[in-house]
Design a protein with these regions (language model features):
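Buried hydrophobic-core signal for structured, non-transmembrane domains
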Residues: 2, 191-198, 252-256, 309, ...
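Residue-level signal for short segments within beta-strands and strand-turn junctions
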Residues: 125, 212-214, 258, 429, ...
Length: 572
């Protein structure tokens, strides 16, 4: 070991990029580490020495000048910071970037900036390791087991912020957001505090664009430059729209961009953004006066509510939405259904959620009762359903004379069950309904605990076979903080789904359970349909590690309370 240490030293001692000598990786302790440490200190007074192994073998505390740890939870590193630490704390590995991961970053970065002794960490890791393999006309990125090798580590080589082919993943942008050294803090409406957290850069090298939007539409924009030295703060005033009527949401977005071309990025490259919502979007618009009636038609198998613009039918066997007819066409290919699952992520598998929570994967349903409540200009269908895991679901479908269908899914879970992966309604739409417009966070995927990199805005997209190509297929592509979602065919016909006040959604050409069982995306067969999930919440993606750590408690759906998903559907 000492010979290797000496060889490394001679090879690298004149490289200015080398700032720390490391004694090894996950090798516990021993006298050889003391000898290596002594060699470096005798031969190089300019660099410090690091070794993570002392975390597990404290009798060799003296061989590292850094408290180096791996995958320590945020509350654990804060405990270290509070207890008179003798060494700076650096995680040589943290936020394990395997598959759809890197949630919870806010918890780490608030601590890094609160305690000087907490010096950050190194993401594991930068790039997936996989090998391009060809089988006939198909090329794909292969991992353990794809070459007939056994035993193997399966896809455990896929821990990167960048895919093996060099494509940047959505995780990369979340890391970028938290790494950026331009910090924003809301002081009050019209005033934001900016801190230059760089060590050397003056913020005058950047343009700061201040953009105002109304319900996602552009209103105005201005550009400012501030002269702010490293470590300093500045309070920046910005204009706000004074008259903001009910149903209007104004957002002010601050975007920090490179003023000039740099060695790493072109002119205009975005460094950081910050958004201020001036009015929360409740979407509780005043009802229009309407004397039209809601018609009720009860048949052997269906209960149908109708107005001049829409027909909504519930199955009398299941109590679920069987038809939603717009312009004479039923947009549904199958009955809607409550859905409490997601395609398991690497982290879900790591803490065995796909085993522990399997009772939430397609529980059998038993219709208990359907009650019709007929009011002036409004009809409610109240549906009670029992699940075979001893939980209950109540639906309240309310169609008013303005053709707005309000849906409430009320889940009363069995308190003895495992954590709930997701709370949602699933719709299998006809394939032609694939053009979407949404007002929410986008356009990259975002989740309950991984969303800061995604701006609230107005986005358009088309549902295709494309997905986020994680090395192993899993939950991907969700959007959060969604105010509304429009889904249309080529003729511009379809539906608008509005949150009360917001919802999450996932839309694709694949069923989550098909995604979950596939070991490579190329094996997935797209459906002749559009698969839509309207989601109350799904648990966070986590990422403190990928083998035991759950998402943080605030991002978990525990079965100890009643959950209500509410949204509204109108025809387009």
């Amino acid at each position: 070991m000492l010979a290797r240490c000496k060889s490394m030293f001679e090879r690298d001692k004149n490289h200015p990029s080398i700032i720390i000598w490391s004694l090894g990786n996950e090798s516990f302790g021993g006298e050889n580490f003391r000898k290596m440490y002594r060699f470096f200190k005798d031969n190089d007074k300019s660099r410090i020495v690091h070794y993570e192994g002392i975390f597990h073998h404290r009798m060799y505390e003296d061989v590292s000048e850094i408290e180096s740890q791996m995958y320590t939870r945020p509350w654990e590193i804060e405990e270290y910071a509070k207890n008179n630490p003798k060494k700076p704390h650096i995680m040589c590995e943290y936020t394990h970037s395997m598959g759809n991961s890197n949630g919870n970053l806010d918890a780490y970065y608030k601590l890094f900036r609160k305690y000087d002794v907490l010096q950050g960490g190194f993401v594991w890791d930068f790039k997936d390791q996989a090998i391009l393999k060809k089988e006939g006309d198909i090329s794909y990125l292969a991992y353990g087991g794809d070459f007939g090798d056994f035993p193997n580590d399966y896809d455990f080589s896929g821990n990167g912020l960048v895919f093996a082919n060099g494509e940047v993943t959505p995780k990369f942008y979340e890391i970028k957001y938290w790494y950026a050294d331009v910090l924003f803090e809301d002081v009050k409406e019209g005033l934001v505090k900016i801190k230059n957290d760089y060590l050397f850069n003056n913020l005058n090298r950047y343009d700061i664009f201040i953009t105002t939007t109304k319900n996602g539409e552009f209103v105005d924009e201005k550009c400012v430059t501030i002269d702010l030295e490293p470590g300093q703060t500045y309070e920046l005033e910005y204009d706000v729209v004074q008259k903001r009527y009910k149903g209007e949401e104004y957002i002010v977005t601050f975007t920090v961009k490179e003023k000039n071309e740099t060695i790493y990025a072109p002119k205009g490259h975005e460094v950081k953004h910050h958004q201020v919502v001036l009015k929360p979007n409740t979407l509780k618009i005043e009802r229009e006066e309407n004397t039209n009636k809601v018609n009720i038609n009860e048949e052997d198998k269906l209960i149908t509510l109708s107005t001049e613009k829409v027909k909504v039918s519930l199955s009398k066997e299941s109590g679920l939405l069987a038809q939603y007819i717009v312009n004479g066409e039923n947009i549904l290919k199958e009955e809607s259904r409550p859905y409490f699952w997601r395609a398991s992520t690497n982290n879900d598998r790591g803490f065995k959620n796909e085993v522990d929570a399997v009772t939430w994967r397609n529980p059998n349903m038993n219709l208990v009762n359907i009650k019709i409540e007929n009011y002036i200009n409004l009809v409610n269908l109240v549906v009670d359903i029992e699940l075979d895991n001893n939980s209950t679901v109540t639906y309240v479908y309310s169609l008013d004379s303005n053709s707005k269908l309000k849906v409430q899914q009320i889940l009363n879970p069995n308190r003895d069950l495992a954590k709930i992966p997701a709370i949602s309604d699933m719709f299998i739409l006809k394939e032609e309904f694939k053009n979407i417009t949404y007002y929410g966070r986008g356009e990259i995927e975002n989740y309950w605990d991984k969303y800061k990199s995604a701006k609230v805005g107005l986005y358009e997209d088309i549902v295709t076979e494309k997905m986020v190509n994680y090395l192993q297929p899993q939950e991907n592509g969700a959007k959060t903080d969604v105010r509304y979602l429009e889904i249309k065919n080529e003729k511009g016909e379809g539906i608008k789904i509005s949150g009360v006040p917001t919802f999450e959604f996932n839309i694709s050409k694949y069923h989550p359970e098909d995604v979950e069982i596939a070991d490579h995306f190329y094996k997935l067969k797209p459906l002749d349909a559009t698969v839509l999930r309207i989601i109350y919440k799904q648990m966070g993606v986590g990422g403190d590690d990928s083998w035991r750590a759950l998402p943080h408690p605030e991002y978990i759906l525990n079965p100890n309370k009643i959950y209500t998903l509410t949204y509204e559907i109108k025809p387009i």
